[in-house]
Amino acid sequence: MPELRALLTDAGFADVQTYVQSGNVVLSTGVSANRVGGKCEKLIAERFGFEVDVIVRSRDELAEVVRLNPLADVADNPKRYQVSFLDGEPAPEVVEQIAAAAAPSERLVAIGRELYAWHPDGVGRSKMWTKLAGKGLGVRATARNWTTVTTLLEMAGES
């Protein structure tokens, strides 16, 4: 991720930090989230030769995701608790279809542009995850486990 960090720093973003190898970036900027996402997508495509969907949340938005934590009463393993960050609100019928694929022990809560999903038996065994990871959401999405979500918020507090 040093190359990504350097690319974004050279493009004028400040306080650029990366976390693990899955494209998590925390940075400071004075421009809107939409402009940040579009600029990052363009820079990555030009530099690395592939297209990625960049989903952006401000520090305050990420703090709200953590504060809401609608599955805190059941999600006791942060690696099996995921938040899907969407670029728009999913249609209610899409959320219903995803929830219908859930095992009895799984949970799904949609709040705005986030889907909170609890997979107590692991993501690899989840039919609900197959639906969440597919293209059927009708919006662009990226998912992170709870450990990553809270770590990114901690990092954002430092920038």
Give the predicted meaning of each segment.
Residues 1-159:
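Surface-exposed, charge/polar-rich loops and edge strands
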